[in-house]
């Protein structure tokens, strides 16, 4: 078992990483929550696989549990879904002294966290991430949000969980496409902050070799994010480097209506494209983009998409949350493991 402490004064919490942790979720929940009712927000796929077993596991600790399930996919992270969830919580008579659990990938984590931050002006929640992307990235750091038609994560808040429970064995039920989704974010951590992690990923023989070491990889990624979040909770400084590849990535997701490319796949393409642009402008060490592209291809990730001459891309980039008063903070690399913030404008991409 590995435990990381995210130190944020009264908002501090633990990240617990352990194989087969799902058999002990109820016991861990009891260490941070002494209320009565627990509402689990999940999606239909995960509910079919884990819903009943996890519900019983938590009930065995004396809690009253209700499961609320949504349709899988990014389109559930919208305002149209919220009233139905709020009403189910009201029917369950959930109070501010009760608990919400986010059981799922990045979409469920963002959605359930946003619900927790807004229902009754905020109630406690716990993250139980089940996808690689959520385990290494989105479950840690307190960012919760829903999408608008004009872009991703445009309405949200910083709202930290009480606890993050990560069972790497739950990745065994994950379709390969969504494992790849998380690999995009894993590679990102190596790019921005850890040359050692990047070289470790280069050194694995293949994806199966990586999977055998996945607990260690999850820990390293969470530890990098923990450090960045502690130093810059509200994402106004160094934490921004976590958005490497995301400016173009979000634009790609939006252009393809969140259907063709998953978040991690789009970020992988964004990292590759931005590195090539930065090298051409002498803002990144020569050869860096080639190493990134090679590593992405090694793990079966897409590296390019044609968004040239597409006005939608420009509009999507304008809505990027790193676009402040017309100035766009783009995340670039000096070299592998050395991310930095570069202040520019949308014209950077033209």
UniProtKB/Swiss-Prot annotation:
It catalyses: 7-phospho-2-dehydro-3-deoxy-D-arabino-heptonate = 3-dehydroquinate + phosphate. SUPFAM superfamilies: Dehydroquinate synthase-like. GO terms for cellular component: cytoplasm. The keyword Nucleotide-binding applies. Keywords: Amino-acid biosynthesis, Aromatic amino acid biosynthesis, Cobalt, Cytoplasm, Lyase, Metal-binding, NAD, Nucleotide-binding, Zinc. Disulfide bonds: none annotated. Pathway: Metabolic intermediate biosynthesis; chorismate biosynthesis; chorismate from D-erythrose 4-phosphate and phosphoenolpyruvate: step 2/7. GO terms for molecular function: 3-dehydroquinate synthase activity; metal ion binding; nucleotide binding. Pfam families: DHQ_synthase (PF01761), DHQS_C (PF24621). NCBIfam families: aroB. Belongs to the sugar phosphate cyclases superfamily. Dehydroquinate synthase family. This is 3-dehydroquinate synthase. It comes from Clostridium perfringens (strain SM101 / Type A).
């Amino acid at each position: 078992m590995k435990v990381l402490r995210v130190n944020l004064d009264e908002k501090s919490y633990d990240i617990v990483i352990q194989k087969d942790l799902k058999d002990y979720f109820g016991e861990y929940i009891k260490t941070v929550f002494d209320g009565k009712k627990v509402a689990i927000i999940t999606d239909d796929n995960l509910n079919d696989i884990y819903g009943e077993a996890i519900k019983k596991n938590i009930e065995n600790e004396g809690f009253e549990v209700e499961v609320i399930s949504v349709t899988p996919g990014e389109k559930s992270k919208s305002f149209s879904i919220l009233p139905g969830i709020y009403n189910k919580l009201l029917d369950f008579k959930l109070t501010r002294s009760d608990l919400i659990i986010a059981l799922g990938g990045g979409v469920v984590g963002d959605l359930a966290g946003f619900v927790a931050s807004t229902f009754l002006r905020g109630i406690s929640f716990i993250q139980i991430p089940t996808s690689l992307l959520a385990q290494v990235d989105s479950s840690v750091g307190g960012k919760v949000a829903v999408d608008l038609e004009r872009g991703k994560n445009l309405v949200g808040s910083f709202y930290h969980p009480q606890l993050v429970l990560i069972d790497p064995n739950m990745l065994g039920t994950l379709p390969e496409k969504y494992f790849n989704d998380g690999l995009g974010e894993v590679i990102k951590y190596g790019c921005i902050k850890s040359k050692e992690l990047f070289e470790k990923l280069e050194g694995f023989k293949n994806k199966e070799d990586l999977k055998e070491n996945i607990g260690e990889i999850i820990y390293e990624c969470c530890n990098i994010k923990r450090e960045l979040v502690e130093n810059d909770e509200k994402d106004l400084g160094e934490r921004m480097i976590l958005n490497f590849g995301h400016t173009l990535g979000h634009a790609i997701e939006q252009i393809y209506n969140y259907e063709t490319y998953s978040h991690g796949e789009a970020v992988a393409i964004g990292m590759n494209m931005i590195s090539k642009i930065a090298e051409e402008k002498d803002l990144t060490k020569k050869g860096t983009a080639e190493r990134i592209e090679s590593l992405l291809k090694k793990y079966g990730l897409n590296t390019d998409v044609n968004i040239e001459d597409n006005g939608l891309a420009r509009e999507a980039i304008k809505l990027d949350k790193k676009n402040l008063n017309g100035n766009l903070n783009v995340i670039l690399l000096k070299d592998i493991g050395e991310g930095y913030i570069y202040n520019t404008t949308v014209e950077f991409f033209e």
